[in-house]
Amino acid sequence: MKKWTKKLLEESGYEIKNAQIESVRLTMADHGVLTSDLVLNGHGWGVCYGGYVLGKGYLGSKDFEGYGSGMEAIMRIMDTVGVEEYGQMKGKYVRIATKGLGSSVRIIGNILDDKWFDYESFFADKKDEENDNGM
């Protein structure tokens, strides 16, 4: 996973904004896949952070499949936010890195520490590891 710092993000054209986590959701509703979503509220804007597939299954399914990388992603997000329990993220403040209106938010940061989690590079690295291991 790319090791971001605030300085590197800004040098790469990202704008850093503060946001509050309004809600947290771990759901398999509507998609047949498990996703983790954080609804973020900034000053005059909002965004849902997440949407990556962490497992497959739906209510009443006979087969469920969870991904280790999905669990690791959730744990890394919790570590970045600074909580030990998933539900404790609600109400916490974070920073996001954005390239502006219409761009996806894939990088979230701790409100005080220079600690960041990048969904896109995390899952790209996991995919590369699987390919290297012949999976």
Please report, for each region that a protein language model flagged, where it lies by residue.
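Short beta-rich binding modules
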Residues: 1-135
